[in-house]
Amino acid sequence: MLVIILGVIGLLANQVLGLPTQAGGHLRSTDNPPQEELGYWCTYMESCKFCWECAHGICKNKVNESMPLIIENSYLTSCEVSRWYNQCTYSEGNGHYHVMDCSDPVPHNRPHRLLMKIYEKEDL
């Protein structure tokens, strides 16, 4: 009972102080962000595996229709993303992190694009 009361007080305090709630503001580290947030996460780190739908070694970007089909290769990274207040973090799982201000995001696509192999029909 005490936990419920403290939870309600915490939510009310967040609303009064203008802080984001757990559902709307914070995101625990995950490799599967909410579908409605893919547009944000996949814009600033498009090499994350959760941004792509792959079948038979050919991948299509889930968010950006203008991205070419690619061959599933080392370009795709197993990312985990998290958000705490206004700090958004991408973890690439190999000790590399990209941290940015969520309201002033900075893309981190260039280093990974060098490894992208675009699908050509001759690749079949």
Curated annotation (Swiss-Prot):
Which residues form each disulfide bond in the chain? Answer: none
Which residues belong to the signal peptide in this entry? Answer: 1-28
Give the protein's recorded name: Protein MGF 110-5L
Q: Mind telling me which InterPro entries this protein's record contains? A: ASFV_fam_110
Keywords in alphabetical order, please: Early protein, Signal
What's this protein's family per the entry? Belongs to the asfivirus MGF 110 family.
Keyword field contains tRNA processing: no
**Biological role:** Plays a role in virus cell tropism, and may be required for efficient virus replication in macrophages.
Name the source organism: African swine fever virus (isolate Pig/Portugal/OURT88/1988) (ASFV)
Q: Is Repeat among the key words of this record?
A: no
